[in-house]
């Protein structure tokens, strides 16, 4: 069974007034989509873990701990980290932590929660 870590932004800490985000987006919508994605991945035979980052976090030592505590085959970095300008530094930090603590894991990007499994299949 392939082990995958999904890294995303904690929806409870997102500033939904940010004009980069869709106007109707809410934390409930993100949470529902994330749960559905993880359930789909688990049903497809992946062992998935979720790691959420609070907006504005600069200390990613907990992420480093997660990556050293379990050997992951792949790490998915969600579009909420990559695609929102305010999270750009966080994105760089995440990539460097993954590169340092999970050297053998494939780094995977999705464009939407609904294409996460397709994104994983490209690499695993």
Model region roles, listed by residue range:
Residues 1-20:
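N-terminal, charge-rich interaction modules
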Residues 16-18, 61, 120:
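Short, well-ordered secondary-structure micro-motifs
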Residues 22-39:
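Short catalytic helix/loop segments, enriched in acidic residues and glycine
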Residues 33, 90-124:
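Ser/Thr/Gly-rich flexible loops in soluble cytosolic domains mediating phosphotransfer, phosphorylation
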Residues 42-48:
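A generic structural motif
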Residues 49-58, 110-113:
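Short beta->alpha junction loops
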Residues 61-97:
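Mid-chain, well-packed structural core segment of small domains
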């Amino acid at each position: 069974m392939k082990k995958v870590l999904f890294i995303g932004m904690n929806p409870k800490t997102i500033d939904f007034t940010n004009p980069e985000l869709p106007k109707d987006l809410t934390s409930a919508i993100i949470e529902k989509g994330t749960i559905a994605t993880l359930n789909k991945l688990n049903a497809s035979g992946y062992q998935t873990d979720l790691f959420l980052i609070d907006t504005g976090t600069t200390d990613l030592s907990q992420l480093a701990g997660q990556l050293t505590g379990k050997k992951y085959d792949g790490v998915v970095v969600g579009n909420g980290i990559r695609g929102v300008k305010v999270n750009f530094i966080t994105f760089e930090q995440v990539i460097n932590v993954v590169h340092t603590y999970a050297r053998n894991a494939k780094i995977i990007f999705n464009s939407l929660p609904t294409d996460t499994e397709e994104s994983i299949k490209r690499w695993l």
